[in-house]
Amino acid sequence: MNAQAMDPQQYEQQLEQKCQALTEAFAHYNPPALEVFPSAPAHYRMRCEFRVWHDGDDLYYCMFDNVAKEKVRTDQFLPASELINRMMPALLDELRPNRALRHKLFQVDFLSTLSGEILVSLLYHRQLDDQWLTEARALKARLGEHFKVDIIGRARKQKFVLDRDFVVESLDVDGKTLHYKQVENSFTQPNAGVAVKMLEWALDATKQSSGDLLELYCGNGNFSIALAPNFGKVLATELAKPSVEAAQYNIQVNKVSNLDIVRMSAEEFTEAMKGEKRFNRLGDIDLQSYQCNTIFVDPPRAGLDDETVKLVQGYENILYISCNPDTLNDNLKVLSETHEVVRFALFDQFPYTHHTEAGVMLKRR
């Protein structure tokens, strides 16, 4: 965190600097004009985590300032959603006088939604007992008078859930409301407003598509579910078990009938597509029955490995969302040998930081 950088009056200037840097970094690919999708300048983060500082009878949140190299008391947090900012003092007011709940509490995580749900995770440097559970239930009841809240208690090899370890987000995407189960400790897009813009951009970029879609790294089905109407069938892969389970829930709740998700890594899927190895996890799915003209990838910061780049290169259309423009640039050195960039976008998921989310649509030359 850089506390001095979080000034809404400076937001446009910071965004312009990101746009200029991204445009210059990718100029040699001769992309079309950069499409820019800004964030709200405040209250855009749906999830946050704070350390908890004990000072006598007082108890407060703190974060580490990377520039000043010191902890900063954080009673309110500008980037956090308004719901998180309302919950922050309400929770502390309950915790301060309650020894069972505050004893050796060292961190609080918040996961909120635009739909009004919030999940609070309390992390401890001690084992949790029946007294903690009793007090936590009472805490949930009191907070529940003002919030739609669930609580999780975590300690080493312990996890108590009151009553759910997930929230259900509702996003209005291109005139349609999509519902997403988001599980604690699983990846979700932190900036819901920009996440909607990313989904709408991806929908627009693929609206003239034919055939089927393959997605690697699908998470909870965030993109697959939104993009499904643009394709005959969608096949998606994800390795993390909680994300796969959430994706299956999301498929059902959104009534998507043309999407299958398999629990495999991108590397394993590459082996399966080449026929090098048969995976029982594929079940009855016949890979050869898919006519995937388009592939969608949203890889981790490390980007695509060499074998996956070769796999991706075999598709006519490539939609690539990147949380690390440096590794996107590396991957494009190979992909640009066979494909050209026809859409180029910046999504400002993380205002007031150097992080930039980029999107490119490539078509075979």
Swiss-Prot record:
GO terms for molecular function: rRNA binding; tRNA (uracil(54)-C5)-methyltransferase activity, S-adenosyl methionine-dependent; tRNA binding. The active site is at C323 (nucleophile), E357 (proton acceptor). One of its GO terms (biological process) is tRNA methylation. One of its GO terms (cellular component) is cytosol. Keywords: Methyltransferase, S-adenosyl-L-methionine, Transferase, tRNA processing. It is an enzyme of class 2 (transferase). S-adenosyl-L-methionine binds at Q189, Y217, N222, E238, D298. Its EC number is 2.1.1.-, 2.1.1.35. Transmembrane segments: none annotated. It catalyses: uridine(54) in tRNA + S-adenosyl-L-methionine = 5-methyluridine(54) in tRNA + S-adenosyl-L-homocysteine + H(+); uridine(341) in tmRNA + S-adenosyl-L-methionine = 5-methyluridine(341) in tmRNA + S-adenosyl-L-homocysteine + H(+). The keyword Methyltransferase applies. Coiled coil: none annotated. InterPro entries: MeTrfase_TrmA_AS, MeTrfase_TrmA_CS, SAM-dependent_MTases_sf, TrmA_MeTrfase, U5_MeTrfase_fam. NCBIfam families: trmA_only. Belongs to the class I-like SAM-binding methyltransferase superfamily. RNA M5U methyltransferase family. TrmA subfamily. Dual-specificity methyltransferase that catalyzes the formation of 5-methyluridine at position 54 (m5U54) in all tRNAs, and that of position 341 (m5U341) in tmRNA (transfer-mRNA). This is tRNA/tmRNA (uracil-C(5))-methyltransferase. The gene is trmA.
